[in-house]
Curated annotation (Swiss-Prot):
It catalyses: 3-methyl-2-oxobutanoate + acetyl-CoA + H2O = (2S)-2-isopropylmalate + CoA + H(+). NCBIfam families: leuA_bact, PRK00915.1-2, PRK00915.1-3. Gene3D superfamilies: 1.10.238.260, 3.30.160.270, Aldolase class I. Mn(2+) binds at D14, H204, H206, N240. The gene is leuA. Pathway: Amino-acid biosynthesis; L-leucine biosynthesis; L-leucine from 3-methyl-2-oxobutanoate: step 1/4. Homodimer. This is 2-isopropylmalate synthase. It comes from Sediminispirochaeta smaragdinae (strain DSM 11293 / JCM 15392 / SEBR 4228) (Spirochaeta smaragdinae).
Amino acid sequence: MPRRIKIFDTTLRDGEQSPGASMSLEQKIKMASALERLGVDRIEAGFPVSSPVQFEAVQRVSATVKKAEVVGLARCVQRDIDAAYDALRDAAHPMLHIFIATSPLHREYKLKKSKEEILDTVRECLNYGGKGFSRMEFSPEDASRTEPDYLVEVVKTAIECGATSINIPDTVGYAVPKEFGQLISFLVEQVPQFSDGSVDLSVHCHNDLGLALANSLAAVRSGASQVEVTLNGIGERAGNCPMEELIMSLDVRKDMFDVETGIHTEYLYPTGKLLQSITGLLIPRNKPIFGDNVFVHESGIHQHGVLNKRETYEIMKPERIGRSSETIIMGRHSGKHALEDKLSQYNIKLTRQQFEDVFARFTAIADKKKEVYDEDLFSIVGTVLGGVVKGFSLLYFHTFTGNSLIPGATVKVRSEAGEKVASATGDGPVDAVFNAIDECVGINARLKEYIIHAIGSGKDAQGEVKLEVEIEGATYGGKASSTDIIEASAMAYLNAVNRFELRKR
């Protein structure tokens, strides 16, 4: 039977320490609920003593979360422990997390304490914490740079004083996988409570050298029973071990790890996107698991392979993490197989000569653009066929807005049925344009996601809009770019509507 690995999420505490990642109380509650749905075992809600806002956040999360353990951080200081106890009073499953640094650098320059003084502090604080908590985690900060024999002494002392979980932090991301794995193996050998499972052995790895995931996986193979993570890898400096990367590494490579977690992987991507929307920290396009490029293929050779058998170039299914399965990006490296597949999605049927003409025109455009959008293909096919491909196209738009005006828009759209003009108001000019388009096309679409980013720099930079809309219970994506972000938004919205219309037919 696979060994069970606990997932300790610290997105709300360590993750929020990432510059620009601060969250409001309501946002923290929303994230905590999403993390609980995801299936994490422990949620570190904050550092209660650090501020009234942190205290209230831990308090509110404690009252919201019912299944996962809610954790409050504290230094080895009695007032910190008291604050954590008060903040966690309403938690169904409260846990105290106490830490103190143990490495020579921290002992000499930060704490100015001897080894024995630190051991005395550990005894005093854990004994005090045990009066209010049945579950306590202890972290010897900077453990990876602490003398191994002294680290064992500190760990054994903490367990004797009531710690039910010991966390080994690579606080500054200094360790490398072989070294960190050996440290975990050494602790398992020296501390019987780790091998018999009566005390959790946790790891908390930072990513300063880009090794947080590798070190965490090395620790799991060496006997760690819990891994501390953040969604999207956010956190101090270079961040923490990304939950999504750890979970899918363990999932995809079961042959190497033979472990299981309680994570419902189909909620990974939606939860990561929720965090992005709350913090505004964009997920890089090439980020493992969550990046936009992970499940898309532009190379003709790769596209041909994926169209025949997805496993040729994909080691996991996007649906496994809650992503859509659209995988082909049309660009300069795309081949005929990919173009045929894209046209078939819209039920566009061509003779062999017409297809060759379309492919030649497509190649010419692809050499000039990073990505060829569906609207470009519609235009090419329309030119070759001598008519308009089924769908809607934007003829013009006009918007007005201001701090004392209700934003509005007028839009003119062309389709097979003719041209139509509509006006609408909205919560800003983009929303007004979308509402006007709905009037023109006669469809009620609900915007689910809207992302914009710059292509290039300076005054000639283009804004690329990527969005998703829900129509009749199904989700359709759209993309477009323009130097005018409202125009790009309108074109992307029509792109999504055209996907619905053309696939419906």
